[in-house]
C-alpha cells in the first residue's frame, strides 16, 4: 500500500509492527492462547477473603493510563471489560525491562489484542482488577478504533453515524456498548423458538434456496442462472411449497428457519435478504395456530427478557397471551366507515377513489383491499392483534372459510403497527389450488409482477393427498426487533444490505502526466487534495507548490521538488 494512502496514526502503527518483529516478537502469533476466565465471571465470583485467583484472560486494550513504572489498562473480552494493573517489575522480573518500557508503553496501541496472566484483587478504590504477571501480544491493530469514552453516564467521542455503524459492524460491536447484547438476544430468540417446536415433536428441515419456480408468496424474486443445466433459477421468496410437500410425504410437523430473498425496496422494516421461520402441522386449522402462535411468542419474550412486556419506541407492548382477534373487513369498516362485504372489484375501486388513494389498473380486488387495510388500519394495531378472515383474492394458498366462501381461513399478527406473522388453514384441494394459480396468472397478465406462478409439481403433490394442515410464517428479523426494542431492521442484522460505498473520484496517473507531471508526483498531488486534474485549475501555483513539497518532506519521500514555475506550467496546460 502507498504510504500516502495511510493516516499518520496508521503509519505509526505499521512502524510499531515492524519494530515488534525486529525485536523477535511476532505480532500475529499462530499458537493457541489458553484462557480460563471471562471478565464478567471474574467480577461475579470474586471474594475478598479467598486466596487470590490465578487467571488467564485475553481481549482488546481499550484504554491505558501510564504512571511511570505502573499502569492501568481496560481489557475488553467477549463478555465485558475489566481493569488490569501492570507494573514494570512484575511483567519484567529480570534485568530486561523491554516488555514494559518499549513494548507495552510505546509499541502497543489501543485496540491491540493482548493476553494477560495474573491474579485477581481489589484496588484501594474498590475496583475488582487483575494484577498482571505476564503480558503476551496476540494481534496488532494497525487501524485506530474510534475509542468511545464513558464517564458518569455520559458518552464521549461516540461512534454513532448509522451508515458507518452498519457498514463497519465489526467496529460498532467493538466500541459501542449494548450492540452485542442485541445479537445475543437474537440468538436467544432462535433457541427459544426451536425449543418450543422441538418440545412439541416437530422436526427442523431444510429445503432448496435455489428454486425453478419462485412460489409461496407474492413478491419479486432475484434471478440467477445455472450454467451446467443452462436454466434460470430463482432465489427463494418463501419455503412454503416445499414444506407442504413434506406434509404430503407423511411428516406431521415440520419447520424451517432460513434465508429468503425478495428483490424489492429497503426501508426501516425491510431488507432484501431476510430470515423467516415457517412451520406446518398436519390435522390443525388456523384457530389452533392462533393459540399456538401466541403461546410461542409469550414464551420467547419471557425467555429473552424475563418479562412479557417490551418497550419499543414510545410503546409498551405486552406479549402475554391471549391476543385480540379482529376480522380484516371488520377492521376496514371500523377505520374507514366502508363495509366491503360482498363488493366486487369495481365497487372497491370506487371506495379507494373516495378515500383519495393512489391505485392503478394492475390492482385486482385482493390488492385493492390490501392497500386499504395497509393505509388506514395496519398502523393502528400496537398491541398484538390477530387480523383474520382475509378475502379469497388475497390468499391463493389458503383454504376457503368454512362459513363464507368469499373469505379464507387466514390470519396475520399485527404488532406495533406492522405485520409480524402470516398463517392459514392450508389449501389442500388440488383442483381449487390449480384454479387459484390460474387466477394469479391472469393478474400477472394484467401487469402484477408479484402474482404467483403456477407450480405444477406442487399441484401434483396435492393430488396425491395432503391432510388438513395449518401453516405459519414469521419474520425473524422483525420478531428480534420487537424482542430487543429496536425500531429499524438494520439494528438487528449483523450486516444489512447497503448501497455501494461512496468513493472519492480520482483521475488516472496518465491524465496528470499529460500536463508534464512525473508519475511519482501523482500520489503526492492527490494526497494534497487534488484528486482530479480539474481540481488544480484555479489553484495558486505558490500554494500548490508549498502543499506538495510539504508532503514530500513530511513523509520523507525524497522526491526532487519541482519549481514554482514548473507548477505554474502544469496549471496553464489545464483546459
UniProtKB/Swiss-Prot annotation:
Q: Which cofactor does it need?
A: Mg(2+)
Top EC class of this enzyme = ligase
> Which keywords belong to this entry?
Aminoacyl-tRNA synthetase, ATP-binding, Cytoplasm, Ligase, Magnesium, Metal-binding, Nucleotide-binding, Protein biosynthesis
Cellular compartments per GO CC: cytosol
Q: Which GO terms describe its biological process?
A: lysyl-tRNA aminoacylation
The catalytic activity, as recorded, is: tRNA(Lys) + L-lysine + ATP = L-lysyl-tRNA(Lys) + AMP + diphosphate
GO MF, one annotated term: lysine-tRNA ligase activity
Identify the residues that bind Mg(2+) 1. Answer: 412, 419
Report the EC number(s), separated by commas if there are several: 6.1.1.6
Report the InterPro entries cross-referenced here: Aa-tRNA-synt_II, aa-tRNA-synth_II, aa-tRNA-synth_II/BPL/LPL, DUF4332, Lys-tRNA-ligase_II, Lys-tRNA-ligase_II_N, Lys-tRNA-synth_II_C, NA-bd_OB-fold
SUPFAM superfamilies listed in its UniProt record? Class II aaRS and biotin synthetases, Nucleic acid-binding proteins
Q: Which residues bind Mg(2+) 2?
A: 419
List locations, semicolon-separated: Cytoplasm
The record's remark on the cofactor is: Binds 3 Mg(2+) ions per subunit.
Stored NCBIfam families: lysS_bact, PRK00484.1
Instruction: Report the sequence similarity comment from the record.
Output: Belongs to the class-II aminoacyl-tRNA synthetase family.
PANTHER family in alphabetical order: LYSINE--TRNA LIGASE, CHLOROPLASTIC_MITOCHONDRIAL, LYSYL-TRNA SYNTHETASE
What quaternary arrangement does the UniProt entry report? Homodimer.
Name of the protein this chain belongs to: Lysine--tRNA ligase
Q: Which gene encodes it?
A: lysS
Amino acid at each position: 500500500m502507498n504510504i500516502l494512502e495511510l493516516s499518520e496514526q496508521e503509519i505509526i502503527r505499521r512502524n510499531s509492527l515492524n519494530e515488534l518483529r525486529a525485536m523477535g516478537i511476532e505480532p500475529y502469533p499462530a499458537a493457541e492462547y489458553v484462557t480460563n476466565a471471562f471478565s464478567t465471571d471474574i467480577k461475579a465470583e470474586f471474594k475478598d477473603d479467598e486466596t487470590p485467583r490465578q487467571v488467564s484472560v485475553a481481549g482488546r486494550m481499550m484504554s491505558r493510563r501510564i504512571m511511570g513504572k505502573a499502569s492501568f489498562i481496560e481489557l475488553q473480552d467477549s463478555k465485558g471489560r475489566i481493569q488490569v494493573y501492570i507494573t514494570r517489575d512484575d511483567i519484567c522480573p529480570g534485568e530486561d525491562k523491554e516488555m514494559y518500557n518499549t513494548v507495552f508503553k510505546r509499541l502497543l496501541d489501543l485496540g491491540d489484542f493482548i493476553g494477560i496472566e495474573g491474579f485477581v484483587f481489589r484496588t484501594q478504590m474498590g475496583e475488582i482488577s487483575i494484577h498482571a504477571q505476564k503480558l503476551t501480544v496476540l494481534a496488532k491493530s494497525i487501524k485506530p478504533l474510534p475509542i468511545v469514552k464513558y464517564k458518569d453516564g455520559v458518552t464521549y467521542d461516540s461512534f454513532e453515524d448509522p451508515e458507518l455503524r452498519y457498514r463497519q459492524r465489526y467496529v460498532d460491536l467493538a466500541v459501542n456498548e449494548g450492540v452485542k447484547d442485541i445479537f445475543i438476544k437474537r440468538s436467544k430468540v432462535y433457541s427459544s423458538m426451536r425449543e418450543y417446536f422441538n418440545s412439541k415433536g416437530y422436526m427442523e428441515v431444510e429445503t432448496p434456496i435455489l428454486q425453478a419456480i419462485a412460489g409461496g408468496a407474492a413478491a419479486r424474486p432475484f434471478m440467477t442462472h445455472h450454467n451446467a443445466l443452462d436454466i434460470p433459477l430463482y432465489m427463494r421468496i418463501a419455503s412454503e411449497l416445499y414444506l407442504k410437500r413434506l406434509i404430503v410425504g407423511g411428516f406431521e410437523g415440520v419447520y424451517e428457519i432460513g434465508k429468503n430473498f425478495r428483490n424489492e425496496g429497503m426501508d426501516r422494516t425491510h431488507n432484501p435478504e431476510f430470515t423467516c421461520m415457517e412451520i406446518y402441522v398436519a390435522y390443525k386449522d388456523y384457530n389452533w395456530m392462533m393459540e399456538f402462535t401466541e403461546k410461542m411468542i409469550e414464551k420467547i419474550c419471557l425467555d429473552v427478557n424475563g418479562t412479557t412486556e417490551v418497550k419499543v419506541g414510545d410503546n409498551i407492548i405486552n406479549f402475554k397471551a391471549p391476543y385480540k382477534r379482529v376480522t380484516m373487513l371488520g377492521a376496514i369498516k371500523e377505520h374507514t366507515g366502508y363495509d366491503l362485504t360482498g363488493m366486487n372489484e369495481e365497487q372497491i375501486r370506487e371506495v379507494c377513489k373516495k378515500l383519495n388513494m393512489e391505485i392503478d389498473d394492475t390492482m385486482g380486488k385482493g390488492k385493492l383491499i390490501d392497500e386499504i387495510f395497509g393505509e388506514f388500519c395496519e398502523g393502528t394495531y400496537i398491541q398484538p392483534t390477530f387480523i383474520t378472515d382475509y378475502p379469497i383474492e388475497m390468499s391463493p394458498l389458503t383454504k376457503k372459510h368454512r362459513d363464507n366462501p368469499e373469505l379464507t381461513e387466514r390470519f396475520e399478527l399485527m404488532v406495533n403497527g406492522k405485520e409480524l406473522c402470516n398463517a392459514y388453514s392450508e389449501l389442500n384441494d388440488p383442483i381449487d389450488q390449480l384454479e387459484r394459480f390460474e387466477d394469479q396468472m391472469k393478474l400477472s397478465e394484467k401487469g402484477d409482477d408479484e402474482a404467483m406462478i403456477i407450480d405444477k409439481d406442487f399441484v401434483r403433490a396435492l393430488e396425491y393427498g395432503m391432510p388438513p394442515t395449518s401453516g405459519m410464517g414469521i419474520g425473524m428479523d422483525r420478531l428480534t426487533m420487537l424482542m430487543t426494542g429496536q425500531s429499524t431492521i438494520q439494528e438487528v442484522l449483523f450486516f444489512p444490505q447497503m448501497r455501494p460505498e461512496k468513493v472519492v473520484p480520482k483521475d488516472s496517473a496518465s491524465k496528470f502526466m499529460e500536463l508534464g507531471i512525473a508519475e511519482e508526483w501523482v500520489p503526492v498531488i492527490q494526497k494534497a487534495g487534488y484528486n482530479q486534474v480539474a481540481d488544480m485549475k484555479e489553484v495558486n501555483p505558490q500554494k500548490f507548490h508549498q502543499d506538495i513539497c510539504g508532503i514530500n518532506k513530511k513523509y520523507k519521500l525524497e522526491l526532487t521538488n519541482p519549481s514554482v514555475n514548473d507548477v505554474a506550467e502544469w496549471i496553464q496546460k489545464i483546459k
